[in-house]
C-alpha cells in the first residue's frame, strides 16, 4: 500500500487478517507487525495504527490511499470495526481525510454501506464477479465498478467467467458519465492493461502482481 501510494498509484490496505486472530495466529502476528501494532491490541486499534503508518509514510509523496474491506455477512463484524477506525481517524484529522479518501468494498452486497460512504464523502469502489452485483452497485451509488474475472486472487465468483468476457459486458451495461469501470484478475503487465483500455475500461486493479 505504501509503495503503491508513493509511486503515484492508489495504495490499498487489506483489512481481513484480523479475522485470523484465533484461527491463524501466524498470519495475524505478521499483520500486526506490518501495521506497527501489538497482538494484544483490539481490532479497531490495529486498524488505526495501520492506517496511521500508511499516512505517515506517504506524507512526502502526498500519496492517496484507501482501505479494501470484505463486507459479506460472514465478516460483517470485522467490516464494522474497519469502518469505525476509518470514521474516527478521518474526523480527527483534515489531512488524513484528504488523503485517506477511498473505500473499496468487496465480497458482499454494497447496499448496506451506502449511507456510511455518503456520510464520509469517500470515493467508493466495489469489487464483484457478475452483472447482478454490478446492478446493485449502481443502485447503491458506487462510483467505480471493479469487475473481477475468474483469474483474480481471492476471487468470489461461483462461475468461471474470465476477465476478457466479464469486463466488456460490464462496460457496455453500466459505464456512464457518473460511473467508472475497472477490471481486475489477470492484469499484470503493460499488454494486459492496454487490453483493458482497448475494451473501454477506465483502469485496472492489481494485487498479486506486486508480490510476484
What spans do the regions from the language model cover?
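Gly/Ser/Thr-rich loops at beta-strand to alpha-helix junctions
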Residues: 110, 187-188
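Active-site entrance/lid segments in N-terminal catalytic domains of soluble metabolic enzymes
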Residues: 1-177
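Short hydrophobic "strand-cap" motifs at the C-terminus of beta-strands
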Residues: 184
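Conserved active-site-proximal phosphate/metal-binding subdomains
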Residues: 155-180, 188-212
Amino acid at each position: 500500500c505504501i509503495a503503491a501510494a508513493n509511486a503515484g498509484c492508489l495504495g490499498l490496505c487489506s483489512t481481513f487478517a484480523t479475522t485470523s486472530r484465533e484461527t491463524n495466529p501466524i498470519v495475524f502476528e505478521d499483520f500486526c507487525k506490518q501495521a506497527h501494532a501489538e497482538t494484544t491490541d483490539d481490532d479497531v486499534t490495529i486498524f488505526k495504527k495501520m492506517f496511521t503508518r500508511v499516512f505517515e509514510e506517504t506524507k512526502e509523496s502526498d500519496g492517496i490511499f484507501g482501505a479494501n474491506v470484505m463486507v459479506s455477512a460472514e465478516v460483517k463484524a470485522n467490516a464494522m470495526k474497519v469502518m469505525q477506525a476509518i470514521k474516527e481517524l478521518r474526523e480527527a484529522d483534515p489531512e488524513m481525510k484528504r488523503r485517506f479518501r477511498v473505500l473499496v468494498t468487496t465480497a458482499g452486497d454494497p447496499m448496506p454501506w451506502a449511507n456510511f460512504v455518503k456520510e464520509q464523502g469517500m470515493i467508493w469502489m466495489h469489487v464483484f464477479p457478475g452483472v447482478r452485483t454490478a446492478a446493485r452497485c449502481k443502485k447503491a451509488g458506487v462510483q467505480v465498478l471493479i469487475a473481477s474475472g475468474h483469474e483474480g486472487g481471492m476471487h468470489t465468483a461461483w462461475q468461471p467467467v474470465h476477465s476478457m468476457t466479464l469486463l466488456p459486458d460490464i462496460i457496455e451495461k453500466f459505464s456512464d458519465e457518473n460511473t467508472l469501470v475497472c477490471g481486475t484478475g489477470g492484469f499484470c503487465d503493460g499488454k494486459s492493461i492496454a487490453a483493458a483500455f482497448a475494451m473501454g475500461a477506465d483502469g485496472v486493479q492489481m494485487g498479486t502482481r506486486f508480490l510476484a
